[in-house]
């Protein structure tokens, strides 16, 4: 398993998109707003899978989808967590780090000042069958989903600062 990037945003990637703005940030800002809507919808779909069907293939697909769109915008920590969800859905990984370890990798920890990093956590109380070999993967995906929500919140803070508006 690769290590999570220390920067929330890869500005080299995002600046390529921003360069298309031509003195008007509406283009790049519009892409970010679309991503925000897309991410919230995808998080909800993942949660429904964890609460309902518990389909690892669908969770893999959702993780892959969000990994691609977040990576394209340079939102590299979200992309990293979504890749873990994808790999857990494929049973290619068997571990997910705890939240404190991941938060401690941030290059600028001041972004978390005043934020309750556990505020939006869904309880990791998904109903699993102890005899189901997929149970551990579902529990780890639930843990990763909570982390992706935190990374999403941190990315929104950074992007809101850049665009000087609440995104």
UniProtKB/Swiss-Prot annotation:
The phosphorelay mechanism involves the sequential transfer of a phosphate group from 'His-576' (H1) to 'Asp-1144' (D1) of SLN1, then to His-64 (H2) of YPD1 and finally to 'Asp-554' (D2) of SSK1 or 'Asp-427' (D2) of SKN7. SMART domains: HPT. Changing residue 86 to A: Reduces phosphoryl transfer rate. Changing residue 74 to C: In NH1; causes resistance to the antifungal antibiotic pradimicin. Residues 24-129 form the HPt domain. It comes from the Eukaryota. The modification Phosphohistidine is found at residue 64. One of its GO terms (molecular function) is protein histidine kinase binding. The keyword DNA repair does not apply. Interacts with the response regulatory domains of SLN1 and SSK1. Phosphorelay intermediate protein that is part of the branched SLN1-YPD1-SKN7/SSK1 two-component regulatory system, which controls activity of the HOG1 pathway and gene expression in response to changes in the osmolarity of the extracellular environment. Catalyzes the phosphoryl group transfer from the membrane-bound osmosensing histidine kinase SLN1 to two distinct response regulator proteins, SSK1 in the cytoplasm, and transcription factor SKN7 in the nucleus. This is Phosphorelay intermediate protein YPD1. It comes from Saccharomyces cerevisiae (strain ATCC 204508 / S288c).
